[in-house]
Amino acid sequence: MVIRMRREKPELLVPASSLEVLKTAVIFGADAVYIGGEAFGLRAKAKNFSMEDMAAGIAFAHEHGVKVYVTANILAHNDDLEGARAYFNELKEIKPDALIISDPGMFMIAKEVCPEIEIHISTQANNTNYQTYLFWWQQGARRVVSARELSLKEIAEIRKHIPDEMEIESFIHGAMCISYSGRCLLSNYFTGRDANQGACTHPCRWKYAVVEEKRPGEYLPVYENERGT
């Protein structure tokens, strides 16, 4: 198979946590904006968008030729599914340009409820190789967001093996996780708050010490530099 490369200007996609931020991003030149609603996204503690603000934001962006993508990228449990179906029915009416999804069950519901809306596969789905990209392409996804931990060399290799029409999205700025996205269980273990449900407490940013079991109370601090930990 011969894959011909298109040379197009990359899309500058930025997050927006509120209607005001969305409008600012649009005015200052974003090509697209991604936002989260009050459920099913990974920023459970953020203010997020009401359905009314989401509709207003999408309308404003479209007036300025800017696209809006809505996140629904939790790893869903059984009791999330009916709510997700209702949510996608509401989103269908306000016409976002794409849904950002990581869970195959959520993907299936979105395809059924709003087949006219593009689906992008979230970085939360651990997209680390070209076969994963091809899998999602065959399921009907147009874009896959690379795992944030991939190198430019790895992303270039993926590009060589996927259809020219398939889009790759990559983060160039933002928080990094200690683990591949979606694979960290620290928050759930320490606090009972599930990172894959949008409630991460970021325990990877806490300060830790090492204790030898026969010397309780003697804490050795942990440092990291260019030589390691």
Language-model regions, residue ranges each:
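A broad detector of the eukaryotic-type serine/threonine protein kinase catalytic domain
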Residues: P96, A141-R142
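Conserved nucleotide-cofactor-binding alpha/beta core module
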Residues: Y130-Q131
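The substrate-binding groove and active-site-proximal loops of carbohydrate-active enzymes
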Residues: R43, R142-S146
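Catalytic domains of cell-wall/extracellular-matrix polysaccharide-remodeling enzymes
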Residues: S146-E149, E154
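Active-site pocket-lining/capping segments in soluble small-molecule metabolic enzymes
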Residues: V2-N127, E154-T229
